[in-house]
Structures are given as structure tokens and as C-alpha cells.
């Protein structure tokens, strides 16, 4: 049998076996008792509903109401469990799709004597520049404990593949700057999308010196948000979001009247919520809105704040019935907003800074389309197209604008 045929047969067997194994693991996982979020268990929030007590103490009519509410909670729990299963299944399918090509590449490399090449994230490139004389262990499976730049310790990462900020002792030839010079340089670097990593590294180099300076702390939290946006690895994103949120908490505690502290704490809460269960997502949503409003109170002329509030209002206006019901069950009140309210915030952005961003024009077009004001929607689609695509957000907005334009022309 030719050597190539042998390789193909072995590859097919291994890939097939891996696929069957993953399928069996998934099947057993689904059959086991779930640890997914159970809504009633999370209702210990001060005004929690103790159904058994209510049934004993209330008159029969109120007891019937309590039973009905209990059944509503059970239905919501089942629906939430179903949604959780679907999300887990989607994630497992995604992982499987990613794993099989990598497995094939690895086997081909082993059979052909080749070395597997891994994709490198922005953080890996940054570390290579900073540690040109230090050889990284690209295939190590050992865990490493990363110290956060705010002086906190995070959980161990899974592999060395997740390249988090370099410890201070490895940084060489660091130029010492005073606080004003550091802030100016970090802000200037951050203006350029391709130099945000460099801005982050600069702040890392000076964390010990300025860790108690409020102007440094909120910028450092912002830099972690930038790293979250740049990263493509889930564990890295969690790492940056959590440390950034911790720094944001430190900032608002030390400077409760600093609008930028509230702004970036709100943003980091939004990032952290991406990895949380339903209750925490809703909780972080309230926290996001609370600190966004405080930031607007202290920075009424900052257009970015109104853009974020517009995004929040638009998202809330699109909540489904089940999402609203769950929010009401968990917190006793329902987040509410309208497309018109979202539009007013986007218009405020344009008033403060015309041509603020492609995304702002895109959301204005969406709002006008939802309000059936087609001419206005097309106007802002056209304005969005005129702005350059610089960031990933710009590119995503450009794609969305094309979809909106196409739908409006039908």
C-alpha cells in the first residue's frame, strides 16, 4: 500500500475516533445532572420569594397567587436551562470544528516530520518584542499564575499559549517618565489602533511607580479594555476583562466624582458580563447603566458616553419577552427603553462631535429604519460609508450598513 494511502487511512481513523469520543463525551455530559444556573437558587437578593412560607402565611387567594408565581419560576427555569444547553451545544460544535482541522494538521506534521505552526495573538507578538532574548515555550502544557497589573492575583491559566502581561523583572531598558509625560505618551499611542498594545506595555512598565495615581489607574483599566478588544482568545479576554474591572472598582472607590473612572468601569462591567450566566448578565447590565449615568453627570460633553447609552437603550428596546420576564423575576423591575430614546442619544453624539464614528451613523440608520423613516435611514447609511474603516468596529459597522441599505432598497 502506498505511503500516502497509509497516512490518509491513519488520519481518517484518528479523526473519526476523536469525533466519536467527543460525541460520547457530549452525550454523557448532557445526560448528567446539570450545574446550569437554576433561577430560584439565585433569588436571595433581600426581597427573595420564599414560596413555602408564603403559602403557609397567606390567605388562600394569595397562596394561589404564590403557587402561580412558583410555576412561572419553574417555567422560566426550564426555559433558561434549555437556552443554556443550546449555548453549550453551540460552543461544543464550535470547539469541535476548530479541533478537527488542528488535529489533522498535527497528524500530518507528525507523519511528515513537520513542525506545527500556531497562530499568534497580539499579546504573543508584544511579548516577543519585549523578550527578544528569552525563548518562549510554545508547546508547554504547564499552567502559569499571572499577577494582575493592579496588584491582584488571578486564577491559573490553562496553558502557556495564553500569553498574559510580562512580569516586571523581564522588562529591560524601561525609560522612566514622570506622570504627565507618561499619560501624554500613553494617550498618543492609543490614538493609533495598531499601537494600543504598545500603550498598554508602557503603562505596565510604570505600574509600580504610579499605581496609586487616579489618572494612571483609570487609564490602566482602559488599557485592559483595549487588550480585551484586541485579543481573540477566550481565556485572554476573561483575564483582561476581570483585571480591568478590578482596576475600575479601585478607581471609582478612590475618585467617585471622576467621570472617566465611572466610564471605564461601566465598559469593563460590560466585557465581564459576556462570560457570565443570565442573572449576572442582567446584574452587570444594571451596573453598566448606573455608572454610565454617573459618568454623564460628571462629563456631560463627552460624546462617547452618549454613544454607549444609545447602544444600551437600543439593546434594551430589543429585549424579548422571556428576557424581560427573567429580569423582572430576578430583580423586581424590568429594564425599559425605546428606539426613540436610543436615537436621541445617537443624535446627541452627532451634535457634540459630527462624524464621531461609522458605528454611530450605523445605529442612527437602524433606529430610523425601525421607526420607518426610510429617507433618514438611507441618509445615515450614506454618511457611514463615507467614513474610513480603521478599527475592527468600523469594519463590522461597514458590513451592517450594507445589510441595512440592501433591506431599505427592497
Swiss-Prot record:
It is a single-pass membrane protein. GO terms for cellular component: cytoplasm; membrane; mitochondrion; mitotic spindle pole; spindle microtubule. Residues 71-109 form a coiled coil. The keyword Coiled coil applies. One of its GO terms (molecular function) is microtubule binding. It comes from the Eukaryota. Pfam families: RMD1-3. The chain crosses the membrane at residues 10-27. Residues 122-153 are annotated as: Disordered. Keywords: Coiled coil, Cytoplasm, Cytoskeleton, Membrane, Microtubule, Phosphoprotein, Transmembrane, Transmembrane helix. It is found in: Membrane; Cytoplasm; Cytoplasm, Cytoskeleton, Spindle; Cytoplasm, Cytoskeleton, Spindle pole. Disulfide bonds: none annotated. The modification Phosphothreonine is found at residues 139, 154, 157. Gene3D superfamilies: Tetratricopeptide repeat domain (1.25.40.10). The modification Phosphotyrosine is found at residue 152. The modification Phosphoserine is found at residue 121. Its main location: membrane. Residues 122-131 have a biased composition (Basic residues). Interacts with microtubules. Belongs to the RMDN family. This is Regulator of microtubule dynamics protein 2. It comes from Bos taurus (Bovine). The gene is RMDN2.
